[in-house]
Amino acid sequence: MNMLSFKTSFGWITLTEGNNKISSVEFGKNKNKGKSILLTKLQKQILEFTKGKRKKFSTKLKIDGTPLQKKIWHQLSLIKYGSTKTYGDIAKILNTSPRYVGNVCGQNNHLLIIPCHRVVRSDGTLGGFSGLGGIKLKKKLLNLEKK
């Protein structure tokens, strides 16, 4: 397993790769371990994103979860840059509860790539965010995408 931590304008981000797929994208600092072209390419894409110069990511993800969790994460990945959907919007598509969608968002190991920060409450408030920095970071990410 390879790991790469780097600093962005949103704080430290740590990428983890195994078997030539990204296994996690998390906020926070960790020790670098090994080298990987895949990690270096994703680092470049994330740095471009944090500067407002990239709207989509292109990488291979290793996604572990139940079939319903994977469907929810897929729905999140369809939310376009600069847009938001509610937990209820996602729940309705998959015939599940908004609360469950929120719980699955909190289990997302691929922050930014699977954009759980684009999911908000039906009353327009932000809801939660599992990334280090919580709601403040979620608001910052959404503001970046509004520009």
Regions found by a protein language model. Give the residues of each.
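Basic nucleic-acid-binding alpha-helical/helix-turn surface characteristic of O6-alkylguanine DNA
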Residues: 1-99, 144-147
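Generic structural "secondary-structure junction" signal
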Residues: 59-65, 121-122, 128-131
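Structural signal for hydrophobic
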Residues: 76, 116-117, 141
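Residue-level detection of the helix-turn-helix DNA-binding "recognition helix"
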Residues: 106
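Acidic, glycine-rich catalytic loops of TOPRIM or P-loop NTPase phosphate-binding modules used
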Residues: 109
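Short Lys/Arg-enriched helix C-cap and helix-to-coil transition segments
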Residues: 112-122
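…primarily DNA-binding HTH/wHTH and HhH modules…
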Residues: 125-147
